[in-house]
């Protein structure tokens, strides 16, 4: 993936303001609520029976933070995203058997969460850069499936 200087600035500038715990928890919770079939990968998380149960679930919050923390590695390694996610791709493919489409869904939800948190600061140019990033991460995570 080729990044312009402007795209890199838009991504890193916004990332510096992201509350990883809050946005990560919200993104994963939204994934589980909006796309309930994704819950089958999280059966060990306990009660996911309703939106309020998912939103209040400490395991969802903790894993959401973990997911977005690892996403931060993409921000730090924009020029080497494939290698950054090689091990996670292997884990999600070989051991967890996660449908790679779920990576794309989570990326799209992250865009919604960022737009909600940053409002007018999440300009169309910023959104375009972040959309490119979430696609690159989803592609890197799906790499072991090909």
From Swiss-Prot:
Gene3D superfamilies: Globins. GO terms for molecular function: haptoglobin binding; heme binding; metal ion binding; organic acid binding; oxygen binding; oxygen carrier activity; peroxidase activity. Red blood cells. Pfam families: Globin (PF00042). It comes from the Eukaryota. GO terms for cellular component: blood microparticle; haptoglobin-hemoglobin complex; hemoglobin complex. Residues 2-146 form the Globin domain. The keyword Metal-binding applies. Heme b binds at residues 63, 92. CDD domains: Hb-beta-like (cd08925). PANTHER family: HEMOGLOBIN FAMILY MEMBER, HEMOGLOBIN SUBUNIT EPSILON. Involved in oxygen transport from the lung to the various peripheral tissues. Belongs to the globin family. This is Hemoglobin subunit beta. It comes from Psittacula krameri.
